[in-house]
Amino acid sequence: IGDVDLNFDDNGKIKNDYEVKGFIKNGKLKILKKNSINDLSFIFNLKDQEYQIKDLRGVYNKIELSSDSINIKKKEQEFLIEGELSNEKDNINIKVFNNLFGGDLLDTNIETINFASNNKYTFSLNRQFKINDLKLKSNINLYQLVYKNNLNNLKEYIPNINESIELKDHVLLIDYEKNKIDIVGEGKIILKDKIDILKYKIKKKNDQYNFDTKIYINENPILLNSILY
C-alpha cells in the first residue's frame, strides 16, 4: 500500500523529484540464493537515488530481526547501505549468522550461542547482490556460548578441564571491518563445574591476533608447578 507523487516534463517523462511512500506487511524477501526473510513488514519512502526503510520487522531462519532505520543510496553500479539491526535473545545457528553478513564473523568451533544484539552497519551491494566493504559495530548481550575446547595447553594448568568451555552473561563491544576485528568483553567463564570471571580484548588484523586477556580463577584449582617450571 502506498502513495505516489509524480511530476512529468514537457515530453511526458517522469521528473527526478518523484516520491513514493507506503508500507509492506507480511512480505517475503529472497536473499543469499537459498535464504529469505519472512514475515517482513516495514514503512518505505522512495526518492530518486535514495530509499529509506523504517520500522522493519522480519524473521530470518527463526532469528527475529528488527530495524528502526535503513538508508540506501544508489551510486553508479552499486548501492550504499547504512542502518541499524537488532535481534532479541535467541539461539543462533552459526552458519546462518555468517551467511547473513557474508563472511566468517563467528568461529565454527562454537557449538551453542544465545545472545541479543544491536548492530550499526554500512556496506555496499553490487548488481550481483554481493556485499562489499562491510563495517559493523555491535553491542552484544551474550547469555551463553559453548565453545569446543581445542586449547590443549590449558590442560597443563587446569586438570580435568571440560571438553567444552562455556561463557555466560557477557557484555561485548565488537568493531568489525574487512580483515580487521576488535572485541572487548567481560563475563563469566565455566572451565569445569564452577564459575570464574573473564575479561578480554582481542584484536585481529589479517591473520594476526593480539590478545589481552585476564581470567580470575577463584573457584577452579590450577597446577602452579606447570606455570612455575
Residue spans for each PLM region:
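Membrane-proximal interfacial segments on either side of biological membranes
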Residues: 1-229
